Structure formats: structure tokens, C-alpha cells
Amino acid sequence: MKHSTSDGTVYQRNGFGPTVVLIHGLGMNRAMWQWQLPSLTKDFDVLTYDLWGHGESSNPPSRPSLRLFSDQLIGLLNEANVTTTGVVGFSIGGMIARRFAYDHPSRLSALAI
């Protein structure tokens, strides 16, 4: 099911279990994970989202940076009531995942880049 946060981040949440967030690559959107979702949602609560300026999400509120995208992710987790999560990042998503791990280590249960 598709949702939108107060800052214009569009995301989907599917499955049950520990939460895992999937971050897409530059110029892509959350649909890139469509082939992994059937397997992952059997065991995990999976959040996929569009980075600001990608897919259905709004444009970034200021000049894009890894810090800004890390802030986008923490905002998403707060609005979705997720306390800890595993994060999987592809391409720039991996860079954002590393920045998120640096900024919010207590919110991270696992990291895959």
C-alpha cells in the first residue's frame, strides 16, 4: 500500500517481521525493488521509498546531500513508527545508508550495501 509523509516522501510498506528499508539508486525509484519484494515480505516488514526528486516523492527542500537524504530517511522512520531497521542501499542508496548509519547508529539493526 502506498503512503506519503508530511515532507512529501512517497513509500510503500509490505510484509511482517523485522523492518528493512530498501534505498534505490540515482535516477531510479522504489519500483526497482519489485522483484525482491515477494521473497523479502515473507519474513520482513519492508519499506521502499522514493528519494526526494525521484519517482513520486516531492523535490528536495534544499540542495541534495547525503545528510539531507539521511534526514529524509529518519523522518520516514519516525512517521512510520519504526524504532530500528535494517537498511539496504544500492548505488547512491548505499552512500545514503552509510550516512544514516553514521548519523543514527541507535536506529540501525543491520546494514547492507
What are these regions (language model features)?
Residues 7, 31-38, 47-88:
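Active-site loop/oxyanion-hole signature of alpha/beta-hydrolase fold enzymes
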Residues 28, 53, 94:
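Active-site micro-motifs of SAM-dependent methyltransferase domains
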